[in-house]
Amino acid sequence: MSRIKGSWINFWKIPDQRYEFIFAAVILTVVMLSSVPFLTQIEMRPGVQLHDPVFNYLPAHDLSDLIFYILYTALLLGVIFLLPSPERLVIGFEAYALFVVLRMITMTLVPLEPPNGLIPLVDPILSFMYTGKQVNKDLFFSGHTATMYLLYLMLPAGIYRKLAFVGVIVMGICLLFQRVHYTVDVIVAPFFAYGALRIVLRLRRTIGLKASGFVAGE
């Protein structure tokens, strides 16, 4: 605990880092709040339903509870593991906000209908955010998979990072059984998460913010 406290005290002493933390928190809050009316509009828009041959080999099954526990347990543990590294945590916030924006862009450009046989994903937290309305058209790409992969990228090398990678795979498979995403949604999600992180790191270098030699997994 003293190590975490010391890291944050030293981090907060530097004005640029302090301002960046506040900026990242504000941007993330604005993006998340903006996603609520955005997804409400997406739900009312017609889209194209894709044929996904992978579903021929995967029986539909409700895995809402497992998906819920994997995601939020991973997020909670991820934040705990990143607390000793404030700068890494801030970079994670920035990358997450950017990939949410990228999701909004791709959903706007690629209107899709949910897969046949979709089993509504029960998520009390998201349900609260979206005022109890079921969101089914947040397609291309999978936010759950991208979140898990971004967490994997942010964690330092070690057993927990390896477990996070396993979590990415399990999450993707569960979403396909749930029929809430097409296979392509799941496959491309890690690329968007990685791209968001690389863009954030490049922007930081461009404006003169260092990342203490940050390399994913180190």
Residues covered by each model-derived region:
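Aromatic-anchored segments of alpha-helical transmembrane domains
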Residues: 32-33, 100-106, 168-179
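Interfacial helix-loop-helix junctions of multi-pass membrane proteins
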Residues: 138-140, 170-196
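N-terminal transmembrane-helix/juxtamembrane module of multi-pass inner/ER membrane proteins
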Residues: 2-74, 112, 217
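Alpha-helical transmembrane segments of integral membrane proteins
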Residues: 19-27, 90-98, 163-166, 184
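Membrane-interface loops
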Residues: 42-53, 83-161, 168, 205-218
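Membrane-interfacial alpha-helical segments at the cytosolic side of multi-pass membrane proteins
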Residues: 75-80, 145-164, 190-200
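Internal transmembrane alpha-helix with an interfacial aromatic "cap," most often the third helix
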Residues: 70-87
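Alpha-helical transmembrane segments of multipass membrane proteins
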Residues: 27-35, 39, 102-107, 192-197
